[in-house]
Amino acid sequence: MSDFTQTLDTDGLATITWDCQARPMNVMSKQGFADLNALINGCLTDPMVEGVIITSAKSDFAAGMDLAVIAETKDMHPENPAQGCFEMVMEIHQILRKIELAGMDFKTKKGGKPIVAVLPGTALGIGLEIPLACHHIICADNPKAKIGLPEIKVGIFPGAGGTTRLVRKMGAMAASPYLLQGKLCSPSQAQAAGIIDAVSTTPLEDAKAWILAAKDTDLVKPWDAKGYKMPGGAPYHPAGFMTFVGASAMEIGRASCRERV
């Protein structure tokens, strides 16, 4: 059975629900991405679909990527495992970019379908990277939930766009604790930091209302809009350059301290 299923209501709103039934929390697999991609394709081409909600049937959204996928991909490409992993990551990028553009004409920035992520609870790794590609992120008012990109803690980095989207959304300095330290936060902290858009006691209802009220301009990511400037300065802007230099020095120092303890 697929980890992703879809329903369509009378308002033309499709709800894609993630539910890995054999696991206590959702984790992403290669087949899971293929299933999600197929549903997104269907929603974007179906004239009956006005907008999409991506959510979870569980009390949490997702624990991240199934790390076994990396090992499996390497085994499938013994002659060049690095190339195999690269191609897999690029396929994931294409799926998330498809969600981000949502069928819009890139020149006119019109014609897209609004896609909202509704997080009932914890969203980690790919469980946050998928929402970051959506046009609006609403998290349930769940104080036990944790939101973040903890990949760095196991020696990898958020390879599905988390590094680029979070930096472009928040700026390098603000994003660095989440990317370089794997910092996790509560829904209210994530909203205050600008990672998610809203915390709600009725997230599904709020998502439907947002979709029905959304305009073309609401679907355009800041970094796709004309005149976009990265918060805090781009890497080679004077302010941005100092951020990158300072962040590198601080992380090297922090890592050295941990090694000595």
Annotate each language-model stretch with its function:
Residues 99-154, 178:
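Glycine-rich beta-to-alpha active-site loop
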Residues 56-95, 123, 153-155:
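Glycine- (often His-adjacent) and acidic-residue-rich active-site loop
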Residues 1-55, 79, 253:
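Conserved CoA-thioester-binding segment of acyl-CoA-metabolizing enzymes
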Residues 162-173:
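Hydrophobic, secondary-structure "cap" segments at the distal end of domains
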Residues 13-15, 30-34, 39-40, 174-176, ...:
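Intrinsically disordered, low-complexity segments enriched in small/flexible residues
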